[in-house]
């Protein structure tokens, strides 16, 4: 339905709301081919990209060779063991690892690594997928009549572990889907002060005519206005497909 455009714009504006001023050092952990890394580099940040998938890092390196604003580095690395000195970054982005790491201990390891590499007062922006995303997506796209898809959704709602035994790529890969409050707790458990918990898209991502609305500037602004108005409302945060939590490493 094209709602990734809403996700990307809202993620960027939420990052900038909490980001230090450039030319601060930013680690984009799980940064894939650099969708957010290159954007931040263009804004003047010193960005180091890390991803566990060599193919994606290769794409980022090739892009970096011709980028007008280059990344400091592009490296293959595991979010749970970053090849970075302690207290070396002003901001860490974890915009994928927390839903790709299904085991809670692995997620805590990734968050602990982010805490270690951040300087005191440094910012973390971590993304999650809502526990309810597959149910709402299935409802919007009329997929819940499919028994196999409905079974996947039932499991998602029980324990948050999204398992896709089918060959349908639209059903996403194995992942962990957070309740909003659990994402907050995971950051707090490793020592972060949580400064904001946001629903990224609001309700608009579920609209069947999303692309038509987004392509109309006036209707697009309405989608954004509603997403911003509801972003911190606890009763509806989980209706967004994606969650974003902002935390800060204490200075004391």
Descriptions of predicted regions:
Residues 80-92:
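A short acidic, Gly/Pro-enriched loop at the edge of an enzyme's catalytic core
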Residues 186, 190-252:
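C-terminal lobe and adjacent flexible extensions of AdoMet/dcAdoMet transferase-like proteins
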Residues 27, 35-81:
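Class I SAM-dependent methyltransferase SAM/SAH-binding core
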Residues 23-30, 123-156:
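Conserved class I S-adenosyl-L-methionine
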Residues 101, 167-181:
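Acceptor-substrate binding/catalytic loop of class I
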Residues 5-22:
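Conserved alpha-helix/loop element of class I SAM-dependent methyltransferases that forms part
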Residues 108-120:
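A short glycine-rich, Lys/Arg-flanked "PGG" loop and its adjoining helix->strand segment in the class I
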């Amino acid at each position: 339905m094209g709602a990734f455009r809403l996700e990307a714009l809202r993620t960027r504006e939420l990052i900038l709301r909490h980001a230090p001023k450039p030319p601060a050092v930013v680690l984009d952990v799980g940064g894939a081919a650099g969708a957010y890394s290159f954007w931040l580099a263009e804004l003047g940040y010193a960005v180091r990209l890390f991803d566990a998938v060599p193919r994606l890092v290769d794409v980022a390196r090739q892009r970096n060779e011709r980028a007008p604003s280059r990344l400091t580095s592009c490296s293959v690395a595991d979010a749970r063991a970053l090849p970075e000195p302690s207290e070396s970054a002003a901001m860490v982005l974890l915009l994928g690892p927390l839903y790709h790491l299904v085991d809670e201990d692995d997620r805590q390891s990734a968050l602990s690594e982010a805490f270690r590499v951040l300087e005191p007062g440094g910012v973390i922006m971590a993304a999650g997928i809502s526990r309810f995303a597959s149910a709402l997506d299935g409802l919007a796209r009329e997929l819940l009549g499919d028994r196999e898809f409905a079974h996947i959704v039932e499991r998602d709602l029980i324990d948050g572990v999204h398992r896709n035994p089918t060959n349908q790529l639209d059903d996403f890969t194995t992942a962990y889907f957070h309740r909003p409050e659990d994402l907050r707790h995971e950051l707090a458990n490793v020592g972060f002060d949580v400064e904001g918990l946001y629903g990224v898209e609001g309700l608009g991502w579920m609209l069947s005519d999303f692309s038509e609305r987004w392509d109309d500037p006036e209707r697009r602004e309405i989608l954004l206005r509603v997403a911003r108005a509801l972003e911190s409302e606890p009763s509806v945060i989980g209706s967004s497909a994606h969650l974003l939590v902002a935390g800060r490493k204490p200075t004391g």
